[in-house]
């Protein structure tokens, strides 16, 4: 078995109406994420997905290190992860959920950010923090999906936003 695929007992069928009949892994590593979305260093902002509920929700992980390039200028003497990058990590988690849900129906397409609403930043995120990024699909119609995202560090909400994305290609 390829190490990027979950064992059969950890697979769930895709539940979105647009999805073909395929099995969706419940978790994936960075290699599978990189097969799913086009982002790369320094803009790949999720390290793994620890939960995937096809067509419904997902949890992604971002391990924040002192080596992040954005800390060079935000702020050198007191490093803080920019809030907009936390929202981007939510969007990448959601995009990966879309790709995993749609399977072959997604081939040749990309997920593009459309809107960000009600973004709130509750506390700074810095080196050593692990972001646990929860995204829930609120609804979808045709190629537009709307999500609610919450990022947590040590079970404390640090950021939240509602956002939508469009599948194009």
Swiss-Prot record:
SUPFAM superfamilies, A to Z: Thioesterase/thiol ester dehydrase-isomerase
Molecular-function GO terms, alphabetical: (3R)-hydroxyacyl-[acyl-carrier-protein] dehydratase activity
Enzyme Commission identifier(s): 4.2.1.59
Source species, domain of life: Bacteria
Catalysed transformations (reactions): a (3R)-hydroxyacyl-[ACP] = a (2E)-enoyl-[ACP] + H2O
GO terms of biological process kind: fatty acid biosynthetic process; lipid A biosynthetic process
One GO term describing the cellular component: cytoplasm
Keywords of the record: Cytoplasm, Lipid A biosynthesis, Lipid biosynthesis, Lipid metabolism, Lyase
Keyword DNA damage carried by entry: no
Entry annotated with the keyword Nucleotide-binding: no
Catalytic residues as annotated in Swiss-Prot or TrEMBL: 74
Function per UniProt: Involved in unsaturated fatty acids biosynthesis. Catalyzes the dehydration of short chain beta-hydroxyacyl-ACPs and long chain saturated and unsaturated beta-hydroxyacyl-ACPs.
Alphabetical list of HAMAP family matching this protein: FabZ
UniProt-listed NCBIfam families: fabZ, PRK00006.1
The protein's name in its UniProt record: 3-hydroxyacyl-[acyl-carrier-protein] dehydratase FabZ
Name of the coding gene: fabZ
């Amino acid at each position: 078995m390829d190490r990027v695929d979950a064992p059969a007992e950890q697979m769930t069928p895709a539940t979105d109406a647009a999805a073909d009949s395929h099995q969706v892994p419940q978790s994936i590593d960075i290699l599978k994420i990189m097969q799913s979305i086009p982002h790369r260093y320094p803009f790949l902002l999720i390290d793994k997905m620890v939960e995937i509920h096809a067509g419904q929700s997902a949890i992604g992980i971002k391990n924040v290190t002192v080596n992040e390039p954005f800390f060079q200028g935000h702020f050198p003497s007191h490093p803080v992860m920019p809030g907009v990058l936390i929202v981007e990590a939510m969007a990448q988690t959601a995009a990966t959920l879309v790709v995993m849900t749609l399977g072959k129906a997604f081939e040749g397409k990309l997920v593009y950010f459309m809107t960000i609403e009600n973004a709130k930043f509750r506390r700074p995120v810095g080196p050593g923090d692990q972001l646990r990024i929860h995204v829930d699909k609120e609804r979808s119609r045709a190629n537009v999906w709307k999500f609610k995202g919450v990022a947590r560090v040590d079970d404390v909400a640090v950021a939240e936003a509602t956002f939508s994305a469009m599948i194009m290609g």
